[in-house]
Amino acid sequence: MISLLLFPAALGQDRSKFPVNDHHIVYHDVRVDAGGGIVPWSGDDPSVAYDRNIRAIWNFWIHMRKCSNGVPYYLQHQVWKPDADDERGLGGDQINMALDSWNLLYGYLGDPAIPQNMILMADYWLEHGMSSPTALWANLPFPYNTDIHSGQYDGDMRAGKGYLQPDKAGSFGAELVMLYKMTGNPRYLDGAVKIADSLVAHVISGDAMHSPWPFRVNATTGQIAEQEAKGERHTAAYTSNWSPTLRLFSGLEDLHRGDVAQYAHTAALVTAWIKTYPLATNKWGPFFEDIETAAYSDTEINADTMASYILEHPDWDRNVVAQAGGILGWSMQRLGNHSFEKVQVVPINEQTVYLVPGNSHTSRHASVELLYCEKSGDCATRGQAVRRLNWATYSVDADGKNRYPNDDIWLTDGYGDYVRHYLRAMASFPELAPKDQDHLLRTSSVIRHIRYSPAEISYQKFDARSVERLKLAASIPKSVEGGTMQWDSSQKVLTIQSQSPQVTIQLLPRPDGKGSH
C-alpha cells in the first residue's frame, strides 16, 4: 500500500488556471509516497490509476461532439475546446496515432466500439484526404484541412494547400496494413500498397541534410517546402521519422503483396541512411505540423520511436541494445526537464524549439525505457520510468480531458499519442496492469475479435502462429484451445504460444473470490 503525502494547493505558488509546478500539475495537486516520489494524482496504485485514465480518455473521445458539418470533432481539429470549435485543423499524425492506440486498446478492453471507430477514421481519410492518382506524389494522405470545416484534407498546416508529409503517409500505410489484418477489408491493403509504391518512386539515398524523403513536399509539383527567415532560405528536406514506413514495407513483404523486391530494396536504403546519419549524429529532426520550416527542431517522438523500433527488431543490428540505449540517453540529456526533481521525477520536453514537458512525450519515453529494461535486462531507470508515467497522469481530468501542460487539450498528445504508451508499459511490466482484472496486453499478431467473460477469454487473430501475453488477475487459467500456455502464478501472467487463429482460454475463479471482469 502506498503511503501518501499531499502537497497543499496554497503554498504561495503562482497559480494560473492550470498551473504546472512541483505542487500542482495541470488539474491536480501533487501526491507523493513516503519517500517523496510522485505517485498518480488519484493516490491509487499505478495499476489502478493507469487503467482509470485509459478508460476515461476513451470515453471522452468516443462521446466527443460533431462539428456543424456532421463530422466528428476529432477528425477536423487538433485541439479540443468545450464551447466553440478551435480555429486549427487536424493534427498531422492524429489519425495514425489513434489507430495505433485503439488497436492496442481493443485487445485490452474488448469493446466493439473501438474497431468501429478505427474503421470510421481510416475510411474518412481515404475518402476525403488522398492526393490524386495522377499527382506526382500520388495516393498519399494530406495531413491537414486548410478549410477547416470543408470535410476535406488538402494540404499542410504551415506549407499550405497541396503540400503533404511523406512520413505521415508511411505511418498511415502501416496502420492500413494493421487494419486489413483486423478486418479483412481489401481496401485497406490496396491503400497501403499505393502509399508504398508512391514512396518507393521518390526515395533517394539521402545525406546529412536530406532524408530519403522530405518532411514537406508539394504533391503536384514535387517542390520541397521552403521558408525564408532572417535572410536565409530553409527547406523542409529532412526528418528521421521513418520507422513507421519501415513497418509498412515489412508488413507488405510478409503478406507478399505489392512490389516486395522494391520494398525490400527501399527499406535497406532507408535503414542504411538511419544508421549513417541520425543514429550517428542525433539529428532527429521535425515531426509536428505546427512548427514552421524555418524553425528546425529535434523531437523526442522521432528519437524514442526509433529506439522502440530497434528494440523490437533484434535483427536490426548487432548492437541494438547500445543503439537504443544511446537514443534514450540523448532524449534524457537533451530534453529532460529538471523542474520536478523535488518529487523525484524528470519528465521529457517535446522538442528543442519547445522545451515544455509533455504528457505524451514523457509517457512514451517511460514506456520505451521499460521496453529497454525488458529486452536488455538493464533496469537502472525502471523506477524513474514509473514515476514518469505517474507524472503524466496529472494531465488527465476525471472526465477524460487530457491537457498538455501549460497548453491546450491536444487530441494528439492526450489521446492517440498517450494511451498506447501506458498499454505498452503494461505489456513490458504486467505489474502495471490492474490487479483485479483480466486483460490481453500484447500479441505478435493482430486481434480481429476478442471477448471477455468470467468463464473464458476467446479471441481471433490474423496469424495462426503468434505469441500473446495476458494479465489474469481476476481468474486462473484452466486450459487453452488453439495453443499451449505457460502460467506464472506469482506475476499472474499467462503466455500463449498459439497455433491457430482462434484461441479460447477456459478460466477458473480466483480462490480468494477477488477480481472483476
PLM features: residue spans?
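Solenoidal tandem-repeat scaffolds enriched in leucines and small polar residues
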Residues: 170, 177, 185-279
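Solvent-exposed beta-hairpin/edge-strand motifs
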Residues: 471-484
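Carbohydrate-binding/catalytic loop surfaces
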Residues: 70-90, 136-163, 209-243, 281-308, ...
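Bacterial N-terminal signal peptides
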Residues: 1-6
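Terminal, non-catalytic domain-edge segments
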Residues: 13-69, 120, 176, 182, ...
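Non-membrane alpha-helical segments in proteins
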Residues: 87-108, 120-121, 174-178
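Low-complexity, Ser/Thr/Pro/Gly-enriched N-terminal "stalk/linker" regions
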Residues: 13-93, 112-159, 194, 198, ...
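Boundary at the C-terminal end of the N-terminal hydrophobic targeting segment
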Residues: 8-12
